[in-house]
């Protein structure tokens, strides 16, 4: 194994040398022969969890001896630990909820937004006057019907396409007539495996034509700087762009100091949204990760992200029992407030739905250019805000 250690992530290599665990959940990158590799994994009596053919990856739970054996195969290029990503928005109690409002004729009608999050609760604002949850897939607990045991995904869905029916339009989404395809890849604690997220991304891209998905909203952060993992995300982002999609991510929740931005937020083929506090006089949100990163403006722009009001979820509700669909209980309080850069990512996702409704032929570069030229700089350093905040009057027809 020592002669082949260049195929191993250094952290995994250390764990193996130290005999830390009996099993390891890993991502295996193959340059070819993925099916034969999976057959070999099965013959070693190990479990295969995911196969993401778009990026030639397999996720499996392997023993140390199985890892040793697999390293001998020339088609296997690299093996790394399957780490976690984290949602970056927190529920807070506040009497000063900020709502996202747009007063334009565009509503995102017919435009699909793919979301990888903690799920979506069947909230009235997403079901009335029509059901905006076009598809729900659960990669955590494998349930068949919408639910959200964390609340984050429901909140983001409301920011994008909530109808506002429970608040007489006060807390409607930015693109209220758009629809969502929600994949639950994050558990009730707001953690999700990288492999599940990659598989979710591939699923949304592959089914984008069926649901007219134009935007993929990824309201989470990856805190590591693993070049291999980032290369997998970058390949999938490129695939999304080739199909006319745009990927939106938050800048993350590190302190708003120079060079604090990490993970997928640094990639050039996605739109990265930071956050600012708009509750009083504008100021940068304390936990909005900042650039610069290489020669890029990251984040690309910022959006309000403090005390934002949107949909609440009954996190105790489970949508099925023994294969039978269960219906959600009545909830008295329909809305709550969150703070975090994921709110900004959801807002920009909704704005992009409006842009696609107006012109279905836009590509990633078009969207990024439109957002950039329609933004105003605030009185912050550029590494905190990129191009600044969106001026909707300049952006929307």
State where each predicted segment sits.
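Substrate-binding/access-modulating region of protease and related hydrolase catalytic domains
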Residues: 186-269, 337-339, 343-345, 384
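Subtilisin-like serine protease catalytic core
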Residues: 103-113, 119-134, 144-194, 214, ...
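Short glycine-/aliphatic-rich beta-strand segments at the starts of folded cytosolic domains
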Residues: 12-30
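Short glycine/serine- and small hydrophobic-enriched flexible loop segments
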Residues: 161-162, 202-203, 349-357
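C-terminal subdomain of the subtilisin-like protease fold in secreted/lumenal serine endopeptidases
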Residues: 213-217, 357-397
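Autoinhibitory propeptides
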Residues: 1-13, 35-98, 102, 386
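Extracellular S/T/G-rich loop segment that most often corresponds to the catalytic His/Ser-adjacent loop
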Residues: 265-353
């Amino acid at each position: 194994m020592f002669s082949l250690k260049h195929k191993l992530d250094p952290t995994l290599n250390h764990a193996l040398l130290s005999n830390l665990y009996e099993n390891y959940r890993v991502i295996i990158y193959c340059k070819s022969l993925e099916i034969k590799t999976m057959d070999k994994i099965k013959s070693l009596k190990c479990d295969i969890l995911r196969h993401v053919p778009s990026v030639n990856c397999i996720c499996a739970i392997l023993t140390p001896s199985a890892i040793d054996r697999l390293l001998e195969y020339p088609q296997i290029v690299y093996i790394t630990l399957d780490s976690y990503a984290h949602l970056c928005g927190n529920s807070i109690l506040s009497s000063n909820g900020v709502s996202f409002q747009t007063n334009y004729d565009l509503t995102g009608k017919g435009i699909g937004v793919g979301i990888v999050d903690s799920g979506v609760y069947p909230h009235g604002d997403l079901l009335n006057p029509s059901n905006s949850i076009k598809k729900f897939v659960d990669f955590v607990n494998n349930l068949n019907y919408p639910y959200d045991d964390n609340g984050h995904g429901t909140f983001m869905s409301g920011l994008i396409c909530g109808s506002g029916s429970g608040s007489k339009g006060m807390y409607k989404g930015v693109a209220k007539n758009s629809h969502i395809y929600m994949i639950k890849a994050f558990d009730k604690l707001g953690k999700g495996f990288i492999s599940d997220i990659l598989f979710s991304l591939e699923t949304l891209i592959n089914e984008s034509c069926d649901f007219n998905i134009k935007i993929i909203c990824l309201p989470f952060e990856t805190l590591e700087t693993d070049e291999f993992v980032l290369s997998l995300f970058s390949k999938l982002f490129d695939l999304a762009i080739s199909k006319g999609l745009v990927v939106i991510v938050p800048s993350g929740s590190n302190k708003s100091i120079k060079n604090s931005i990490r993970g997928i937020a640094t990639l050039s083929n996605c739109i990265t949204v930071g956050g600012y506090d708009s509750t009083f006089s504008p100021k940068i949100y304390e936990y909005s990760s900042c650039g610069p990163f290489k020669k890029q403006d990251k984040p690309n722009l910022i959006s309000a992200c403090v005390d934002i009001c949107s949909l609440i979820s009954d996190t105790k509700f489970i949508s099925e029992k023994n294969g039978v669909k269960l219906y959600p209980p009545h909830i008295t309080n329909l809305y709550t407030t969150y703070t975090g850069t994921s709110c900004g990512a959801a807002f920009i996702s909704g704005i992009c739905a409006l842009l696609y409704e107006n012109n279905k032929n836009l590509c990633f570069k078009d969207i990024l250019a439109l957002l950039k030229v329609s933004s105003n700089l605030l009185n912050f350093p550029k590494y905190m805000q990129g191009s600044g905040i969106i001026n909707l009057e300049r952006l929307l027809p």
